[in-house]
UniProtKB/Swiss-Prot annotation:
Residues 241-245 are annotated as: G2. Residues 207-376 form the tr-type G domain. Residues 262-265 are annotated as: G3. This is Translation initiation factor IF-2. It comes from Staphylococcus aureus (strain MRSA252). Keywords: Cytoplasm, GTP-binding, Initiation factor, Nucleotide-binding, Protein biosynthesis. The gene is infB.
Amino acid sequence: MSKQRIYEYAKELNLKSKEIIDELKSMNIEVSNHMQALEDDQIKALDKKFKKEQKNDNKQSTQNNHQKSNNQNQNKGQQKDNKKNQQQNNKGNKGNKKNNRNNKKNNKNNKPQSQPAAPKEIPSKVTYQEGITVGEFADKLNVESSEIIKKLFLLGIVANINQSLNQETIELIADDYGVEVEEEVVINEEDLSIYFEDEKDDPEAIERPAVVTIMGHVDHGKTTLLDSIRHTKVTAGEAGGITQHIGAYQIENDGKKITFLDTPGHAAFTTMRARGAQVTDITILVVAADDGVMPQTIEAINHAKEAEVPIIVAVNKIDKPTSNPDRVMQELTEYGLIPEDWGGETIFVPLSALSGDGIDDLLEMIGLVAEVQELKANPKNRAVGTVIEAELDKSRGPSASLLVQNGTLNVGDAIVVGNTYGRIRAMVNDLGQRIKTAGPSTPVEITGINDVPQAGDRFVVFSDEKQARRIGESRHEASIVQQRQESKNVSLDNLFEQMKQGEMKDLNVIIKGDVQGSVEALAASLMKIDVEGVNVRIIHTAVGAINESDVTLANASNGIIIGFNVRPDSGAKRAAEAENVDMRLHRVIYNVIEEIESAMKGLLDPEFEEQVIGQAEVRQTFKVSKVGTIAGCYVTEGKITRNAGVRIIRDGIVQYEGELDTLKRFKDDAKEVAKGYECGITIENYNDLKEGDVIEAFEMVEIKR
């Protein structure tokens, strides 16, 4: 039987749709409206119910038809009485129709009343989501909302049907009904970090190649070392391929692959970490044997330590006559990097990137450190990873270099990359070869996304392209909203508030000073500050001006910068404003300690400075009883505002300082009066105004620290 709508079925039986709906509801069948389609079993049930009425209607109709037929037979051949009989027949038919209507009406009235639905049983267990309302919880328990509201009232809670319930209240009410409750954890699919899991406990996880970043001071041989490793380990078959610069490359050593990130120094490393990406497994710190520890070397050490990544020191340029590897080891011990030969845990490898000496030893050490770390991934999982580089190519459109961290990436996969999305059209490896799949720790360049992502953005593959599009668009909209909001980086002004909310455990501090002695003294003094709830943690100290790299580190570590007798350069100023990084510049150590200690205790009062906003000359005075002296004034400079502080100046000497009482233009109150206009002014608690006096208006403006 084909599906019928309720109104069609009612029309067939010459009934109202409401009667059918009422009957369905009495059968505990949910009905939304008369347009709802009826299932076969529902039609059968309705047929049984209305069968008697239908039979009665049919029987009555048959009798009427039979009577009409007899009348027609009797009228044959009787021409004279035709009209009379016809009129009688018509009357009879009208009477029959009337009877039919009465019968139907009686049938409707005699129809059995629908029985009220039996109350539903209270379930033994229900699940709920955070923020569930009284009405929603009542529906889950199959009880009236008024019952829940009564129970809440007995608990001392006045609530309505739309009131949200907390976990404790839900458990109390459920316990009263003997129902077990369980909270549903709603997973935000737009948060890509939930797809990144530790694979060590996965039984199907297998060993993956280590990801290595090379950092160090300028001209210490980072690029030469990268080139030397690459050229030493590229096989004959690969040598013919055109090298594709995708920000990373893979080599093979003793049957095991190693992935090197070819990033421009530690700035990119920190930028990626600031976006939440942790891609590096091992850091190679390159130090020239003839130059020793330099400022960028120290920065690289601090960046690697902040990321909690193991460090292998590569002492380069040992083939130079002026090289002194022992001096390098000695200098690095000051920064916690103690060689294994001296009883420490840091691996030192002397090498020459130019000649290739020691390269094999370095690769062997990388393999050992990777083995200890037990780096694993599951190639069968969905592909997830991080963006290394991204650009807009004129011919290919947006492209991104990705590092696959888990799972296997395939051409044709629907992907979300940061706030962008798309379907992978093509995939190229570091040798410029087109590939179809890429496993864990493999760097690839892809095309097919709708926009250019940022370095450090995460990517996740989804099975459905519509889902990827929806998530990508939602993330893009959310990022626009987030950019409009102020950054939540810590500052001394909001430090105590973050401490109260439990957001701050450590106050990360970067100290830059004019001389090493001052820097060390300041660091030691700050470490002695003892405030319950937060610790001062010095993450970087150096001599010299505050630079952009310091701001980048502070932003990544959610820290502040203290400059002692030094100033930030132009790049650092711009970066600090863009990232909302707090910089404090001081000349006295005591002031630094006092300011930070006060901030940690929540006692840091805002500083204000006075700003003169206008002057008015008293042209005439009027004495009014119960009001005092009214000064008719002319604004000569700036403006006079109603909420401003004022001082009365006579012959260059301040006579009084206080507040405005009234400010009027003609007879109307005014919020402000600009230069060139006249106004009437009264001063609170001061009536000794004279012609020629100058009323100076000022405001107290908070100094931005």
